[in-house]
Amino acid sequence: LLNQKTAKYIPVHYVLSNYPHYEPSYYPHKPAVPVNNQYMPYPYYAKPVAVRPHVQIPQWQVLPNTYTPTVVRHPHLPASFIVIPPKKIQDKTGNPTINTIATAEPTLTPTTEPIVNTVVTTEASSEFTITSTPETTTVPVTSTMV
């Protein structure tokens, strides 16, 4: 709109009264001013709905010379985007001294226990296996005979 030249508004009745030969009687009345003129009412034509969007284009806006915000605003991201460093890396760097001390005590204690438990578990499992097999055999035979 800024680059377009606007025609001066001339009343239609003034043109018709002074220059009658412009409008013969067998033509319908049409205004002498262009239809897209913003100063002319639209009695005979439908007003155009939207030739251009009414939103200003950012290039045309006059911007101030100074930077208006005084405080730099950082965007607040949702919790899913916040990166939290994994604790495993921190534990690996901090635990080697603790792990060497801690592994000395459990190594001695479990080493003694599994040997005893393994022997006992093996004997117990073999006894239970042998015992359970005859009992299982005995119970079905007894229940079948009774």
UniProtKB/Swiss-Prot annotation:
Task: Just give the chief location class.
Answer: secreted
For the modification Phosphothreonine, the affected residues are 121
State if S-adenosyl-L-methionine is listed as a keyword: no
Query: What does the sequence similarity comment in the record state about its family?
Result: Belongs to the kappa-casein family.
Biological-process GO terms, alphabetical: lactation; protein stabilization
Spell out the Pfam families in the cross-references.
Answer: Casein_kappa
Q: Which InterPro entries match?
A: Casein_kappa
Give yes or no: UniProt keyword Phosphoprotein.
Answer: yes
Lineage of the organism: Eukaryota, Metazoa, Chordata, Craniata, Vertebrata
Task: From the Swiss-Prot or TrEMBL record, give the protein name.
Answer: Kappa-casein
Question: Glycosylated at which positions?
Answer: 97, 107, 112, 118, 125, 142
- Which residues does this entry mark as bearing Phosphoserine? 125, 143
Question: Could you say which tissues express the protein in this record?
Answer: Mammary gland specific. Secreted in milk.
Q: Which GO terms describe its cellular component?
A: extracellular space
The record's subcellular location field reads:
Secreted
